Amino acid sequence: SYQPDLDGAADPGEIVWTWVPYEEDASQGKDRPVLVVARAGDGDLLGLMLSSQEHRRDDENWLPVGSGPWDREGRDSFVRLDRVLEVPEHGIRREGAVMPADRFERVAAELRSGYGWN
């Protein structure tokens, strides 16, 4: 559930920066923004990566979430719904921003309806 609080610990609704390995080669990756959607039972964060690549707009696994302070150029962003990342709290490089509640709820609704989250 949505509960952002910029207190140093990441919470659902916050966008944080962390290392995300590439799917095709997990030994490589890049630092990128991730929307925290929940906590796993072991305390790790569950998150969805963001992208500002415009070609994501036509991909059904990417949901447009608009622009926000997580992109310093103010570009529209997209959240990837079909790849959930498990991120240890110590793996977060920095807290970035809070996603507005209405946009977070849209992401949550898509996860529930299309991906079986509850």
Q: Regions from the language model: what does each represent?
A:
Residues 1-5, 22:
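Short alpha-helix capping/helix-loop boundary micro-motifs
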Residues 66-118:
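C-terminal terminal-subdomain/extension
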Residues 21, 50-52, 84:
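Beta-hairpin (beta-strand-turn-beta-strand) motif
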Residues 24-29, 114-116:
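Short N-terminal helix-initiation segments at or just after the protein's N-terminus
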